Amino acid sequence: MLVPEISLTPQMVDRFLARFGDVISVLHSKLSIGERYDQWNKIKEGQSKIVIGARSAIFAPLSNLGIVIIDEEHDSSYKSDMTPRYNAKDLAKYMAKNNNIPVVLGSATPDITTFYKARRRANRTTYII
């Protein structure tokens, strides 16, 4: 589950904890190195089934990826201008295609490209508009 800003992480974590319990890890740049290390290991060892975080969470070492959800997909924060440059939304679509899983792009105000593709049903991505 990707969120565009770190500040949105706590409310999303609360929602997921209430529904799924303690199988959640959080990854973002505001965590200390030790916290990130602990979360990374928890994911890698299979103790976490759900990862919530900002764009860098797309690199979480999940071994059995089942779905990718991108909240507020229209937000430009999913693009990294730092090296290495990447767009987490594009990576999510690539990962979903290669793993044959759905990617859900959610937004009340979708990106115009997303809106167009949803109307045209141009690919297997699920669009929530």
Question: Where in the sequence are the language-model features?
Answer:
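Walker B catalytic acidic pair
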Residues: 54-55, 71-73
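Conserved motor-coupling elements within RecA-like helicase/translocase cores
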Residues: 15-51, 59-65
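Short, polar loop motifs at secondary-structure junctions
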Residues: 54-57, 110-111
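Alpha-helical scaffold elements adjacent to nucleotide-binding pockets in ATP/GTP-utilizing enzyme cores
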Residues: 11-15, 19, 39-42, 68, ...
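Amphipathic alpha-helical transducer elements in NTP-driven molecular machines
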Residues: 10, 24, 33-37, 62, ...
